[in-house]
UniProtKB/Swiss-Prot annotation:
InterPro entries: MMPL_dom, MmpL_fam, Mycobact_MmpL. It comes from Mycobacterium tuberculosis (strain ATCC 25618 / H37Rv). NCBIfam families: actII (TIGR00833). It is a multi-pass membrane protein. It is found in: Cell membrane. This is Probable transport protein MmpL2.
Length: 968
């Protein structure tokens, strides 16, 4: 046992002594803490859904542009939208339209989740623009309420519920897809995969631990420690997120879980490896415990601080994709470090009491001693070989291509992917994911002058490379409005004359119809004149008869009056009798007396009739006398109309010969669809259809105009992103020198958003990368107390990072044929910076302990002592991260495999060969500014003063120590 170990045994530091003394209490405290944080709040996935943050960069120009469009048009104030796609087995007919109308009514009524519906298919004016060429599919864009992911997810689920509960007609299916639906499904896929990946990881780690330790009990105890760590980390992060300390995302929860598992397992392997090494060296369990703590605590602390610090540097990022990873994973790693420095030693103490952690087999260090010997013997060739291996990955980097299409990285069975596949069968990707250009000025643009400028903007953009279609007020269906060219307007003047000529010819023919009708009227009036004479004669006879009837009725009335006067007493009896109605004879006689009263009324009416008949026989002759002048006037009108018909007929025949095919020029320009001579007259602004178009493409105050631009190909690609700046440039050039000069130009949409994300990712990667590298360098210098060693660690980490990402490009892109998602680069770089220095740190820390034996011997001993442990830990960490490949979210799988490849490269190449070969080449300069001995000091001189002084005392009198050539 070395003197250092002896001193350690005699007076161990206070922290490990306290941990060993209160080991059971510490274990119980951790169990209680884990139980509390998991019972106090819901599970991490549930809290993540309730406190998720929007993944869209809210301060990006493209997102601001979309929100500005919604504000000026009074439609929406968020950037979340879904696309509802209708697909039929046959062309969509009336049933599909009725289903669509019912669905639109439901969506419009749900103002809690739906902000605005861009209903193009419901308007015949724009229906063709949102319908497939075969009429079997149509789509509508629905803007949702919610600027963060939680509200957006609720809105997506609400829309899906309405679509699912509205029965479509036979042969028609409705799908919900679009950016918001994709993001919601991404979160769902990520959350559902956590449990599956965790279970697979646990089984794989258990198998690896069995292979490493050949002990079921040791493997189970390590898994229990990791499980407690994971439960504490998950619960604590969920507790903080539930109290709004920070927000979460799908990537944060997934990476947090596997990082916690991997780091906790690594730290347990570090401790057990050093404990077993000490036990192999003959130390008792207590001494081995203190040796283990002394040799690994600072490494675990440095590793944890490195990971936590590097991950927290992501908090400086602007993109929520990265910013949401910073605080949760950093805090989780700090909890993992705290658990590793307290719970791990406590469990080791309790387990060692029952001899559970004693090694089952002796460590085989011969292989690693040979590796170390080869390195110190041939450091240059070894370093060259490692650089050659690293170049494999580095050479693959230039071929790196990325993609921004989220659909490819989620299961095809997800609802949004099913809907997107249905839409892709009928529509192009660019048509479903257009760019939106907004031009906002300080005056009303609803006039012919500004319409010319707006059409120029649309024309310039449309004629630029990579543009498939531009929809605007002057081209609502993607092409210029028909009949709006100046040649067509000129041509239509002749067409109008020709059309009017045909109309007038028809009206001339109508004159003949009128003449025929007038002839009929004249003949009818002649017959009426003759019949009127007969009517007058008959009326005179009726008048005489009426006078006679009046006289007879008066005589009848007088005789009946005499009869009634004589029988009045008897009549009174019939009216007084109460039961007269029940006696038929009584009631009939009473009715006869009532009839006598009606004779008086009849006589009176006949007298009135006599007077009217006298008036009638006076008026009828006067009416008959008016008919001959009317017949004469109508005959004259008929003759004049015949003359007018002849005159106009001759005139329009001459005009018809002069205007033959006047619309030829207009038809040619319409067929050619040349938009160089666009003009919209003022009268068009009164057209009802054009007014509907104004509402869609111009703001209510007319001061902002919207353009919907479809790119050629997929906008979520580097090629699509490259079209963004040309669109802005063409718009600025189009308004230069016009009344719209100086107008504000906004551009949003899929390509514009990913352009901002790409630029933001570069900035975030630069900021977070520089901050992480600086932080790691500082931590390494503090722990190693060597500037050169710290620089070597950081340098090899950076080299390993580049090589590992190149290997990931080689595997995913070149071998599997799947391009890496855009965020894989930034996330894997930061994570590799965070975890890549662990094994180098452990190696160099052990090398620092063994340096007293000499530089080369120390390298050999350090390689022998740490080779197996570091390789096991690195393999476990790499496999754990690589198991992300089983996630339903392929993005997570790409990130995990990239980190796994990096850790394998770092473990098997950098730590095993590159770093020790650099240390051997640099010699004592590797430890600068520390002063170290290239060779070990003499055993005889070690307990005494410096070599120069001792030799001065031992040499014969008069001999100077320098004569021996010895130097300290």
């Amino acid at each position: 046992m070395s003197e250092r170990h002896a001193a350690l045994t005699s007076l161990p530091p206070i922290l490990p002594r306290l941990i060993r003394r209160f080991a059971v209490v510490i274990v119980l405290l951790w169990l209680g803490f884990t139980a509390f944080v998991n019972l106090a709040v819901p599970q991490l996935e549930v809290v993540g859904k309730a406190h998720s943050v929007s993944m869209s960069p809210s301060d990006a120009a493209s997102i601001q542009a979309i929100k500005r469009v919604g504000q000026v048009f009074g439609e929406f104030d968020s950037d979340n939208a879904v696309t509802i796609v209708l697909e039929g087995d046959q062309p969509l007919g009336g049933d599909a339209h009725r289903f669509y109308s019912d669905l639109m009514r439901k969506l419009s009524a749900d103002t809690r989740h739906v902000a605005h519906i861009q209903d193009f298919w419901g308007d015949p004016l724009t229906a063709a623009g949102s319908q497939s060429a075969d009429d079997r599919a149509a789509y509508v864009v629905v803007y949702l309420v919610g600027n963060n992911e939680t509200e957006a997810y609720d809105s997506v689920h609400a829309v899906r519920h309405m679509v699912d509960t509205t029965p479509p007609p036979h042969g028609v299916k409705a799908y919900v897809t679009g950016p918001a639906a994709l993001n919601a499904d991404q979160a769902e896929a990520g959350d559902k995969s956590i449990a599956k990946v965790t279970a697979i990881t646990s089984m794989v780690i258990a198998a690896m631990l069995l292979v490493i330790y050949r002990s079921v009990i040791t493997a189970v105890l390590v898994l229990i420690m990791v499980g407690i760590d994971l439960g504490a980390i998950r619960g604590f992060i969920a507790l903080l997120a539930d109290h709004n300390i920070f927000s979460l995302s799908t990537f944060a929860t997934n990476l947090l879980v596997l990082m916690a598992i991997a780091a906790s397992t690594d730290y347990a392997i570090f401790m057990l490896g050093r404990y077993h090494e000490s036990r192999y060296a003959g130390e008792d369990r207590e001494t081995a415990f203190y040796t283990m703590f002394h040799g690994t605590a600072h490494v675990i602390l440095g590793s944890g601080l490195t990971i936590a610090g590097a991950m927290y540097c992501l908090s400086f990022a602007r993109l929520p994709y990265f910013e949401t990873l910073g605080a949760p994973i950093a805090i989780g790693m700090l909890v993992a470090v705290l658990a590793a420095l307290t719970l791990g030693p406590a469990v080791l103490t309790v387990g060692s009491f029952f001899k559970l952690f004693d090694p089952k087999r002796r460590m085989n260090t011969r292989r690693w001693r040979r590796v170390g010997t080869a390195i110190v013997r041939w450091p240059g060739p070894v370093l060259a070989a490692t650089c050659l291996v690293a170049s494999i990955g580095l050479l693959a980097l230039p071929s790196y291509r990325t993609t921004y299409d989220l659909r490819k990285f989620m299961p095809a069975s997800m609802p949004s992917n099913v809907g997107d596949a249905a839409a892709g069968r009928r529509f192009s990707r660019a048509r479903l994911n257009p760019e939106v250009l907004l031009i906002e000025t300080d005056h009303d643009m609803r006039n012919p002058v500004d319409m010319l400028v707006l059409d120029k903007v649309a024309k310039n953009i449309y004629h630029s490379p990579g543009i498939e279609q531009v929809k605007a007020i002057t081209r609502p269906l993607g092409t210029t409005i028909k009949h709006t060219s100046i040649p067509f307007i000129i041509s239509m003047q002749g067409v109008n004359s020709s059309e009017q000529m045909e109309f007038m010819k028809d009206r001339i023919d109508d004159i003949l119809v009128q003449v025929a009708a007038m002839n009929t009227s004249i003949e009818t009036m002649h017959r009426m004149y003759a019949l009127m004479g007969e009517v007058i004669d008959n009326t005179v006879d009726m008048d005489h008869l009426t006078h006679d009837m009046s006289d007879i009725t008066a005589t009848l009335r007088d005789h009946l009056a005499d009869f009634e006067d004589f029988f009045r007493p008897i009549r009174s009896y019939f009216y007084w009798e109460k039961h007269c109605f029940d006696v038929p004879l009584c009631w009939s006689i009473r009715s006869i007396f009532d009839m006598f009263d009606s004779v008086d009324q009849l006589s009176e009416k006949l007298e009135y009739l006599v007077k009217d008949m006298d008036i009638l026989i006076t008026l009828l002759p006067q009416m008959r006398a008016q008919m001959p002048p009317m017949i004469s006037a109508m005959t004259t009108m008929r003759d004049m109309m015949l003359i007018w018909h002849g005159t106009l007929g001759a005139f329009y025949k001459q005009q018809e010969r002069n205007n033959k095919d006047p619309g030829a020029m207009g038809r040619v320009f319409d067929a050619a669809q040349i938009d160089d001579s666009f003009y919209l007259p003022q009268s068009a602004f009164e057209n009802p259809d054009f007014k509907r178009g104004l509402k869609m493409f111009l703001s209510p105050d007319g001061k902002a105009a919207r353009f919907v631009i479809a790119l050629e190909g997929d906008p979520a690609t580097p090629e699509g992103i490259s079209r963004v700046e040309p669109i802005k440039r063409e718009a600025r050039e189009a308004i230069k020198g016009t009344p719209l000069q100086g107008a504000a130009i906004y551009l949003g949409g899929t390509a514009a958003t990913f352009k901002d994300i790409r630029e933001g990712a570069r900035y975030d990667l630069l900021i977070a990368g520089v901050a992480a590298i600086s932080l790691i360098l500082i931590i390494m210098m503090i722990i190693t107390r060597s500037v050169v060693a710290a620089v070597v660690i950081v340098g090899t980490v950076v080299l390993s990072m580049g090589a590992s990402f190149g290997l990931s490009v080689l595997v995913w892109q070149d071998i599997l044929g799947i391009e890496l998602y855009w965020m894989v680069l930034a996330m894997s770089v930061i994570l590799l910076l965070a975890v890549g220095s662990d094994y180098n740190l452990l190696l160099i820390s052990r090398l620092k302990e063994e340096i007293g034996a000499g530089l080369n011997t120390g390298i050999i001993r350090a390689m022998a002592g740490t080779g197996g442990v570091v390789t096991a830990a690195g393999m476990v960490f790499a496999v754990t991260m690589s198991l992300f490949v089983f996630s339903d979210l392929r993005i997570i799988g790409q990130i995990g495999t990239t980190i796994g490849l990096g850790l394998l490269f770092d473990t098997l190449v950098v730590r095993s060969f590159m770093t020790p070969s650099i240390a051997a080449l640099l010699g004592r300069w590797f430890w600068w500014p520390l002063r170290v001995r290239p060779r070990p000091a003499s055993q005889m001189l070690r307990p005494f003063a410096p070599r120069r002084l001792v030799r001065a005392l031992l040499l014969p009198s008069g001999q100077h120590p320098s004569a021996t050539g010895a130097h300290e």
